[in-house]
């Protein structure tokens, strides 16, 4: 992705979905109409973090380049620089892969 001028605020992250396999382990090809949207992605950009009760800035646990798992209905779909991306809160992320 070309460097975007978009920077998420607070505890939000920008995620690019990682495409799922188009073939099963047994070699069956899955048509596009039967595929579900992948729940795995790569973080493209992160916000500066959220503030705790005392007003102290708490940085995010994830960083650009991390591969993550997120919920099926997580985030808001947006199009930036012609690319379909998701913007979600860090709390929508279930975990980091690898």
UniProtKB/Swiss-Prot annotation:
Q: Which PROSITE patterns match?
A: CHAPERONINS_CPN10 (PS00681)
Pfam families associated with the record: Cpn10 (PF00166)
What InterPro entries does the entry give?
A: Chaperonin_GroES, Chaperonin_GroES_sf, Chaprnonin_Cpn10_CS, GroES-like_sf
Going by the entry's taxonomy, the superkingdom of the source organism is recorded as Bacteria
CDD domains reported for this sequence? cpn10
Q: Which UniProt keywords apply?
A: Chaperone, Cytoplasm, Plasmid
Where is it chiefly localized? cytoplasm
Q: Where is the protein found, in the record's own terms?
A: Cytoplasm
Name one cellular component (GO) term. Answer: cytoplasm
A GO BP annotation:
chaperone cofactor-dependent protein refolding
Molecular-function GO terms, alphabetical: ATP binding; metal ion binding; protein folding chaperone; protein-folding chaperone binding; unfolded protein binding
* Recorded coiled-coil stretches: none
Q: How does it assemble?
A: Heptamer of 7 subunits arranged in a ring. Interacts with the chaperonin GroEL.
> What family is this protein classified in?
Belongs to the GroES chaperonin family.
Q: What does this protein do?
A: Together with the chaperonin GroEL, plays an essential role in assisting protein folding. The GroEL-GroES system forms a nano-cage that allows encapsulation of the non-native substrate proteins and provides a physical environment optimized to promote and accelerate protein folding. GroES binds to the apical surface of the GroEL ring, thereby capping the opening of the GroEL channel.
The UniProt entry, under PANTHER family, shows: 10 KDA HEAT SHOCK PROTEIN, CO-CHAPERONIN GROES
Q: What is this protein called?
A: Co-chaperonin GroES 5
């Amino acid at each position: 992705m070309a460097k975007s001028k978009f920077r998420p605020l607070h505890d939000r992250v920008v995620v690019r979905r990682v495409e799922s396999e188009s073939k099963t382990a047994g070699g069956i090809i899955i048509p596009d109409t039967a595929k579900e949207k992948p729940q795995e992605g790569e973080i493209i950009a992160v916000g500066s973090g959220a503030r705790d009760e005392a007003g102290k800035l708490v940085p995010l646990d994830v960083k650009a380049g991390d591969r993550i798992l997120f919920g099926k209905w997580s985030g808001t779909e947006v199009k930036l620089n012609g690319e379909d991306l998701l913007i979600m809160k860090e709390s929508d992320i279930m975990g980091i892969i690898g």
